[in-house]
Amino acid sequence: MSLLTEVETYVLSIVPSGPLKAEIAQRLEDVFAGKNTDLEALMEWLKTRPILSPLTKGILGFVFTLTVPSERGLQRRRFVQNALNGNGDPNNMDRAVKLYRKLKREITFHGAKEVALSYSTGALASCMGLIYNRMGTVTTEVAFGLVCATCERIADSQHRSHRQMVTTTNPLIRHENRMVLASTTAKAMEQMAGSSEQAAEAMEVASQARQMVQAMRTIGTHPSSSAGLKDDLLENLQAYQKRMGVQMQRFK
């Protein structure tokens, strides 16, 4: 895996799924391929994106700044600085300085990532902030190692909370989760259906699932009742996937 592919993989792992993720993936690919050289416009676009957390925006802004060539005097952006200040915690700043000194001695992406992984997310973000604010310099490769370590830390905690939701024994949460997944899968099927012969069938399956979820939410049902909806939709989906040759989000 090339360095930029690895960076793209880690950065996208912390972006919530949805149309925005596809858009961000496209921007990253363009930036890494040298096709997008207007850093100012890119940062303005990033700043106004909904859904993303300030830290995710900060990390993306840092990656864009590292990658897109720009004039030396170009102003640093406040939204990136605020996101990479380690929540203003002086402990994070102290640790960030220690980490920065260690990173100065590293020359490879993997070496930097390894060193950075032993620090907390707050310290890692603060260290990125130091580099972003030009208070310190490291090679681009080392900076990317720091980015990927930070994304791995964030993705780990997201995975833990996702796993907690999936394994929760609270039937109300499981029920709602199944209905949300049914809705998003239906939406994805409708979007994909546009260009296939099975479009009518896909739209029909998706529409039924939507109506069912809507009815359940309106009337209120027993938490176990969505299990049947999930099984039906899953069955239809799998048959549809086989014909389409695609793999879609799995249900829990």
Curated annotation (Swiss-Prot):
<dbReference type="GO" id="GO:0039660">
    <property type="term" value="F:structural constituent of virion"/>
</dbReference>
<keyword id="KW-1048">Host nucleus</keyword>
<dbReference type="Pfam" id="PF00598">
    <property type="entry name" value="Flu_M1"/>
</dbReference>
<dbReference type="GO" id="GO:0055036">
    <property type="term" value="C:virion membrane"/>
</dbReference>
<comment type="function">
    <text>Plays critical roles in virus replication, from virus entry and uncoating to assembly and budding of the virus particle. M1 binding to ribonucleocapsids (RNPs) in nucleus seems to inhibit viral transcription. Interaction of viral NEP with M1-RNP is thought to promote nuclear export of the complex, which is targeted to the virion assembly site at the apical plasma membrane in polarized epithelial cells. Interactions with NA and HA may bring M1, a non-raft-associated protein, into lipid rafts. Forms a continuous shell on the inner side of the lipid bilayer in virion, where it binds the RNP.</text>
</comment>
<dbReference type="InterPro" id="IPR013188">
    <property type="entry name" value="Flu_matrix_M1_C"/>
</dbReference>
<dbReference type="InterPro" id="IPR001561">
    <property type="entry name" value="Flu_matrix_M1_N"/>
</dbReference>
<comment type="similarity">
    <text>Belongs to the influenza viruses Matrix protein M1 family.</text>
</comment>
<keyword id="KW-0946">Virion</keyword>
<dbReference type="GO" id="GO:0042025">
    <property type="term" value="C:host cell nucleus"/>
</dbReference>
<feature type="short sequence motif" description="Nuclear localization signal">
    <location>
        <begin position="101"/>
        <end position="105"/>
    </location>
</feature>
<dbReference type="InterPro" id="IPR015799">
    <property type="entry name" value="Flu_matrix_M1_N_sub2"/>
</dbReference>
<feature type="region of interest" description="Membrane-binding">
    <location>
        <begin position="1"/>
        <end position="164"/>
    </location>
</feature>
<dbReference type="GO" id="GO:0016020">
    <property type="term" value="C:membrane"/>
</dbReference>
<dbReference type="GO" id="GO:0003723">
    <property type="term" value="F:RNA binding"/>
</dbReference>
<comment type="subunit">
    <text>Homodimer and homomultimer. Interacts with NEP. Binds ribonucleocapsid by both interacting with genomic RNA and NP protein. May interact with HA and NA. Cannot bind NP without genomic RNA.</text>
</comment>
<keyword id="KW-0468">Viral matrix protein</keyword>
<dbReference type="GO" id="GO:0046761">
    <property type="term" value="P:viral budding from plasma membrane"/>
</dbReference>
<dbReference type="InterPro" id="IPR015423">
    <property type="entry name" value="Flu_matrix_M1_N_sub1"/>
</dbReference>
<protein>
    <recommendedName>
        <fullName>Matrix protein 1</fullName>
    </recommendedName>
</protein>
<keyword id="KW-0472">Membrane</keyword>
<dbReference type="InterPro" id="IPR036039">
    <property type="entry name" value="Flu_matrix_M1"/>
</dbReference>
<comment type="function">
    <text>Determines the virion's shape: spherical or filamentous. Clinical isolates of influenza are characterized by the presence of significant proportion of filamentous virions, whereas after multiple passage on eggs or cell culture, virions have only spherical morphology. Filamentous virions are thought to be important to infect neighboring cells, and spherical virions more suited to spread through aerosol between hosts organisms.</text>
</comment>
<feature type="region of interest" description="RNP-binding">
    <location>
        <begin position="165"/>
        <end position="252"/>
    </location>
</feature>
<keyword id="KW-0694">RNA-binding</keyword>
<dbReference type="InterPro" id="IPR037533">
    <property type="entry name" value="INFV_M1"/>
</dbReference>
<dbReference type="Pfam" id="PF08289">
    <property type="entry name" value="Flu_M1_C"/>
</dbReference>
